[in-house]
């Protein structure tokens, strides 16, 4: 069989597994808002089956729209009794439509920039320096909303872009002060590189505190998930090749991530994209080293954070879809939060329900994404938490927007930021105690 997104062979096999039970209706965030069969997994499978049988063609009105009414959140995959990989059926069908109908010209331009790190860095640096001219600052969130209608919804809150991308602010090799336990590569992802550099700085601090040597490869760029999600399988494949070549050359023990979607790209999609190439074995070797930072910290380093004091805070946790259902990381962030003595952790009723972001979905379907987000805001508010903690930059952006739109009062932070603050506070306490002992 060819690679899953290269032809429709994989999709054909997966479609045949579906017994049309409708269990997916219970968990699909989009269906729960629209109640339209074409938006749920079963409906999409019927559409793809019709496409495979020639009953519809790629230009059929409504086909592309329905195939893009999917967050690829994997909730349907998780509940499917037949094990149908519905998200990959959707990705394969989107790729087929692009092969037959072509890619929208604007997407071509955007994906070309995303695929070229120097162009991306230049564009994002200019954006950071001139953001105030196009966007207005929001006091409540610290983010920005558009001043003019230029493709973004005027209500959309976007983060403050860094004046200088994170990767430009650190050396490639970062050694701890003490003996190094492990040597890891850090894939920053776009959000922590350009939008939330404090997440990346916090990661570096946590690794330093645990005597982990960190390599930050300068030639890394976008993981390719947004490109693959829009059906540009060719560019996604090129991006996968770039990263496999880069990371296979590094003598590291693990490749660590602060974003579940980026990690899932390396772990799952790169071997799939490169299955029919001579880089397949290398892709599998790279994938075998992929870990979320929290998984690595607790299960490899076996760090003990129970003695780290920080500011007293009540928090809840939102599960990023690809981190929980894709990477299987669920317990580790909660264990970190529960073990910090000054953090009171309160679980939501539906912590694993998608926030409605799905990267660019919240840009192209803003109102629907906010309808989905409203449920999350209500769930958050019911906990009485002051801070919502999560493990994905895209989720941080969406949750921040939702707090503003629906009158929430929570700060949104990444788990690694909470832990980094605790390490910093512990160091301050240690300095104070040493000073006290010297003055006695």
Describe the role of every protein-language-model region:
Residues 4, 14-17, 38, 56, ...:
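Hydrophobic alpha-helical scaffolding
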Residues 13-22, 26, 68-78, 221, ...:
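Cys/His-enriched microdomains
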Residues 16, 35-39, 227-234:
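Alpha-helix capping and helix-loop boundary segments enriched in small/acidic/polar residues
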Residues 1-7, 31-62, 83-110, 408-416:
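Non-heme iron-sulfur electron-transfer modules
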């Amino acid at each position: 069989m060819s690679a899953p997104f290269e032809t429709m062979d994989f999709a054909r096999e997966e479609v045949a597994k579906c017994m049309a039970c409708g269990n997916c209706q219970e968990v699909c965030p989009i269906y729960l808002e629209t109640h339209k069969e074409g938006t749920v997994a079963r409906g999409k499978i019927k559409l793809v089956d019709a496409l495979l049988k020639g009953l519809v063609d790629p230009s059929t009105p409504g086909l592309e729209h329905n195939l893009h009414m999917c967050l690829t959140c994997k909730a349907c995959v998780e509940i499917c009794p037949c094990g149908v990989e519905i998200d990959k059926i959707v990705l394969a069908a989107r790729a087929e439509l692009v092969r037959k109908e072509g890619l929208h010209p604007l997407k071509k331009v955007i994906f070309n920039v995303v695929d070229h790190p120097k162009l991306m860095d230049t564009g994002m640096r200019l954006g950071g320096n001139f953001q105030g001219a196009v966007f207005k600052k929001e006091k409540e969130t610290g983010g920005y909303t558009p001043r003019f209608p230029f493709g973004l919804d005027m209500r959309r809150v976007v983060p403050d872009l860094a004046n200088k991308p994170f990767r430009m602010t650190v050396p490639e090799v970062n050694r701890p002060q003490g003996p190094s336990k492990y040597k890891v590569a850090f894939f920053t992802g776009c959000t922590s590189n350009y939008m939330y550099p404090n997440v990346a700085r916090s990661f570096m601090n946590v690794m330093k505190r645990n005597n982990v040597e960190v390599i930050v490869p300068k030639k890394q760029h976008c993981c390719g998930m947004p490109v693959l999600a829009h059906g540009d399988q060719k560019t996604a494949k090129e991006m996968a090749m770039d990263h496999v070549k880069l990371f296979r050359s590094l003598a590291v023990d693990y490749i660590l991530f602060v974003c579940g979607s980026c990690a899932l790209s390396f772990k799952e999609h790169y071997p799939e994209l490169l299955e029919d190439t001579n880089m397949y074995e290398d892709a599998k070797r790279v994938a075998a080293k992929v870990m979320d930072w929290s998984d690595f910290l607790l299960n490899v380093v076996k760090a003990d954070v129970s003695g780290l004091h920080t500011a007293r805070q009540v928090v809840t946790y939102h599960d990023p879809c690809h981190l929980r259902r894709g990477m299987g990381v669920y317990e580790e962030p909660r264990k970190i939060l529960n073990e910090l003595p000054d953090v009171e952790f309160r679980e939501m009723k539906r912590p694993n329900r998608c926030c409605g972001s799905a990267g660019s979905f919240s840009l192209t379907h803003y109102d629907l994404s906010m309808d989905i987000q409203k449920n999350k805001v209500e769930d958050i508010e019911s906990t009485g938490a002051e801070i919502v903690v999560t493990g994905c930059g895209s989720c941080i952006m969406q949750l921040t927007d939702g707090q503003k739109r629906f009158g929430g009062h929570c700060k949104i932070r990444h788990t690694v930021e909470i832990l980094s603050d605790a390490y910093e506070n512990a160091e301050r306490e240690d300095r104070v105690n040493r000073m006290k002992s010297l003055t006695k």
